[in-house]
A protein has these predicted regions:
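Cysteine-centric segments in proteins
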Residues: 3-104
């Protein structure tokens, strides 16, 4: 299997993040996504492993790509394809919602 490493950079008001996929080229889903970066205000580093995030088709297979999700204890980081970063505690407690910008 060919393993392709691809990376993207997302900058929001609070975070500077790099998203790196370590999955094979052509995979629809990936459970080996690395997010590294830093909180720009506190300087605190962030390193989490996550997965791609998709809608689910009627047959149960992944459909449209939505972005990425990362889990850190009770927190879930959602990074939308549009660059929106949301951090949610538990099921519904929105801790952060910021529009970011993807950079090359």
């Amino acid at each position: 299997m060919n393993v392709s490493v691809s990376a993207a950079e997302l900058v929001t008001g609070t975070y500077h993040l790099e998203i790196e996929s370590k999955c094979g080229e052509g995979n629809v889903t990936c459970e080996s996504i690395l997010m590294t970066g830093q909180n720009k205000h506190s300087g605190e580093p962030v390193t989490l492993t996550g997965e791609t995030w998709h809608t689910v088709c009627a047959d149960g297979s992944p459909c449209r790509f939505l972005g990425y999700r990362f889990f850190d204890g009770e927190l879930t980081y959602f990074i939308h394809q549009s660059g929106l970063l949301e951090v949610i505690a538990g099921d519904r407690d929105l801790k952060l919602s910021e529009q970011g910008e993807w950079r090359d």
